Regions:
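Active-site neighborhood of phospho(di)ester-bond hydrolases with catalytic His/Asp-centered motifs
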Residues: 10-13, 34-39, 63-69, 85-87, ...
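Conserved catalytic scaffold of divalent metal-dependent phosphoesterases
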Residues: 17, 71-164, 223
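Short, conserved loop/helix-junction motifs that constitute active-site signature segments
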Residues: 28-29, 54-60, 94, 132-134, ...
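Beta-strand-turn-beta hairpins that frame and shape the catalytic cleft
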Residues: 2-10, 91-101, 133-138, 190-196, ...
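Conserved beta-sheet core of the metallophosphoesterase superfamily
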Residues: 153-214
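N-terminal active-site segment of His-dependent metallophosphoesterases
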Residues: 1-58, 134
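A general structural detector for well-ordered alpha-helical segments in enzyme core domains, enriched
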Residues: 25, 51-55, 124, 161-168, ...
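Metal-dependent catalytic neighborhoods of phosphoester/phosphodiester hydrolases
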Residues: 21-24, 40-57, 72-87, 111, ...
Length: 224
């Protein structure tokens, strides 16, 4: 239930071509916008991504999205044309809130379509931040989770997080980091003052409720 004095955004990711549960998310249609952290498709291009995103658009036309490592790079062109892209880009989300994203991922054992060196992610993070650093509140959307975080824990103990994302969070301390990539690591925790939330795969029912109320920005891991 939303109140008149608050604003809500809904975040999720790792769609992997399964949006069967998206209309089960409470408040999705009434939210200020939808934030998508990456992996819209399974090695798909613009045609597949547009089919999926048009369904979400019909529920809520205010979309902020980026590709993950499982999406072909051409999808960024489509997102740019629609005005939805946040990868390597900073945008004003509300009066005093900036949002920025970094998609893709560092190399995986699976040779997925959109993998880059860690140094490239660092460049993209700096590029996006430069566009919105004047705003006092910040949401970082990072497909690759920060190194050492619960959001990057594999089931058997290995942590596969990203060092550039961690360094950026430690240095800038955004209010919220919406992340994904590691499906088994649905979690929420703080790194300094930054709330880091990985909702896992959308088809498993995880999403993030981001709320602005009384000038305070917070995020909560939710399940359908």
């Amino acid at each position: 239930m939303m109140h008149a004095d608050e604003k809500i955004w809904i975040g999720f990711g790792d769609i992997h071509e399964d949006i069967s549960r998206v209309n089960e998310i409470p408040e999705l249609s009434d939210a200020e916008g939808v934030i998508i952290s990456g992996d819209i498709t399974n090695r798909g291009g613009i045609r597949k991504a547009s089919q999926l995103l048009e369904v979400i658009y019909r529920l809520n036309p205010s979309i902020y999205a980026q590709i993950g490592n499982m999406d072909r790079a051409e999808i960024t062109t489509y997102l740019d044309e629609k005005g939805w892209n946040i990868h390597a880009t900073g945008k004003q989300l509300a009066e005093d809130i900036g949002i920025m994203g970094v998609g893709y991922s560092t190399p995986t054992p699976f040779r997925t379509p959109s993998e880059v060196p860690d140094s490239m992610l660092a460049q993209w993070l700096n590029k996006g931040y430069a566009q919105i650093k004047h705003l006092p509140k910040l949401i970082l959307v990072a497909h690759d989770p920060p190194f050492g975080s619960k959001a990057a824990d594999l089931p058997f103990g290995e942590n596969v997080g990203n060092r550039s994302v961690l360094e950026f969070i430690q240095r800038i301390q955004p209010d919220i980091c919406l992340t994904g990539h590691i499906h088994e690591a649905a979690s929420e925790e703080f790194i300094g003052k930054t709330k880091v939330v990985n909702p896992g795969m959308l088809c498993m029912g995880g999403y993030v409720r981001i709320r602005l109320k009384d000038s305070k920005l917070d995020a909560k891991l939710m399940f359908i």
